[in-house]
A protein has these predicted regions:
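Metallo-beta-lactamase
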Residues: 68-71, 76-82, 86, 116-171
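Beta-strand-turn-beta hairpins that frame and shape the catalytic cleft
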Residues: 1-5, 40-45, 160-169
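Divalent metal-coordination and catalytic microenvironments
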Residues: 5, 39, 49, 87, ...
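Short, glycine/acidic-enriched loop or turn micro-motifs at the edges of active sites
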Residues: 52, 97, 118
Length: 171
């Protein structure tokens, strides 16, 4: 089975440069792309990261979201003939604002897989703006729905086979 990886373009974010690297290029604006990935060729499609919720949530952090109609996750998936309900797993590299904002658009029978410690950190209140309450609250709802959220632990679980030929580690 040949797997294909497709880049999903979720739009850009304009932000003050020192947000990326503390103290570097203070006052200078940078434009940063926001990407996710779609894995095709297996028994079902997989999505890695879901982008940010909407432009307004970026504005609440003093950033400018540049997400347009074509950047919406459902439209990015449609380019490859995939609907939200076709996706079996959503995997997250981490839960920052620009990576986990669209999980709630997937049905509850799509399993979101995240690192257990990342979920703990996201609900701790540390770095609050990077973990917006609506994004994290939805994950807690998934935690209380059978098979809607799967927690992995990098120190304990190691490599996980999602289907033959497709492996992941809890980031």
């Amino acid at each position: 089975m040949a797997l294909e990886i497709k880049v999903l373009d979720y739009g850009d974010i304009e932000l003050e440069s020192s947000f990326l690297v503390l103290g570097r290029d203070c006052g200078r604006t940078r434009r940063v792309p926001t990407y996710g990935f779609l894995i095709l060729g297996g028994p079902w499609p997989l999505v890695i990261d879901t982008g940010y919720r909407h432009n307004q949530i970026m504005e609440s952090l003093g950033m400018r979201g540049l997400q347009f109609h074509e950047n919406m996750i459902e439209n990015q998936l449609a380019k490859y003939g995939v609907r939200m309900g076709d996706v079996r797993y959503v995997l997250h590299t981490h839960l920052h604002i620009d990576h986990a904002g669209k999980d709630e658009l997937f049905p509850m029978n799509t399993t979101v897989i995240i690192n257990r410690r990342e979920l703990e950190y996201s609900v701790s209140g540390l770095m609050h703006p990077q973990y917006p309450a609506p994004d994290i609250k939805h994950l807690i709802d998934r935690l209380h729905t059978k098979d809607a959220l799967r927690l992995e632990d990098l120190e304990l679980t190691g490599m996980i086979e999602l289907f033959p030929g497709c492996y992941m580690e809890a980031a």
